[in-house]
Amino acid sequence: MGSQVWVVATLLVSIVLIVLTIVKLKFHPFLALLLASFFVGAMMGMSPLDMVNAIESGIGGTLGFLAAVIGLGTILGKMMEVSGAAERIGIALQRCRWLSADVIMVLVGLICGITLFVEVGVVLLIPLAFSIAKKTNTSLLKLAIPLCTALMAVHCVVPPHPAALFVTNKLGADVGTVIVYGLMVGLMASLVGGPLFLKLLGNRLPFKPVPAEFSDLKVREEHTLPSLGATLFTVLLPIALMLVKTIAELNMAKDGTLYTLLEFIGNPITAMFIAVFVAYYLLGIRQHMGMGTMLTHTEHGFGSIANILLIIGAGDRKSTRLNSSHANVSR
């Protein structure tokens, strides 16, 4: 009992240490997580050499799978961004007259958020919110809140986004299954946190017009955008491949050639790899974009994931330190 109390106390102190070093001392999260890992290891009686060895082996093991999928997802998101595919989805949903403007923004955020990091999605899609707000004389808040809620919900719970993919990998869950349930949860959370929340606020929500400095900000001309079919095919292809793998695991004999093929193409790395080259063709080459230009966009996209990969690696080391030092309370 005493050892369990010590473990829980150490864990709680390590969390406080992470928060304080990031918020008060302005440490980078990667450094804060490494510091917490060393702290937990020391409190659990691990030798310095064991702690260093665990960091060396653990970061590589964790990122071996995640780095490939996150990197490929970054390329896919970058192609969505530079080709205007995200705007295409928004324009198409705008034409669904039976949908209210806030629900449209939820669906735009939900679909585009599958391949876009949340901050990229906000920057990329906010001109669409500005455009709808001006055309319909709607408060910008009624459009921006549902959009940001949907983007954040997908970013948190749907692979191949880093946090959701990391948890899925650690738990040994099937990626296809997690995507299906994640999209369902993300949709419900977005509808509650967006349109329903706005209805509950009612007239208490202030009217926010489009800022004057952004009044002339426009969505790209429609004829320059990729087709809706090409856009949706690119976005949904990796999800479909992973779902096919999930269905095969549930319904097929595991010693057949077809099953092996479906397992291969449905692996998250393979599925994202295939989707990237489809995006290069449908969203790049067919949009008159040269390979040199796409290479430049790809390289620019990779710069945004360095922090994510380091933080994931360091965060997993803290978890592994707890397990390595018999700090798993469930034991």
Predicted regions span which residues?
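Membrane-helix interface "capping/anchor" motifs
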Residues: 20-31, 134-142
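Membrane-embedded alpha-helical segments and adjacent helix-loop junctions characteristic
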Residues: 48-135, 288-325, 331
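Residue-level recognition of pore/gate-forming positions within transmembrane alpha-helices
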Residues: 15, 37-38, 110, 186-190
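Hydrophobic mid-bilayer segments of alpha-helices in multi-pass membrane transport proteins
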Residues: 7-19, 26-44, 67-72, 231-239, ...
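Alpha-helical transmembrane segments of multi-pass membrane proteins
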Residues: 99-114, 136-156, 174-188
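Short, hydrophobic transmembrane alpha-helix segments
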Residues: 19-26, 47-50, 252
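Long, contiguous bundles of hydrophobic transmembrane helices that form the permeation core
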Residues: 2-5, 180-297
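Membrane-embedded alpha-helical segments of multi-pass transporters/permeases
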Residues: 19, 23, 41-45, 114, ...
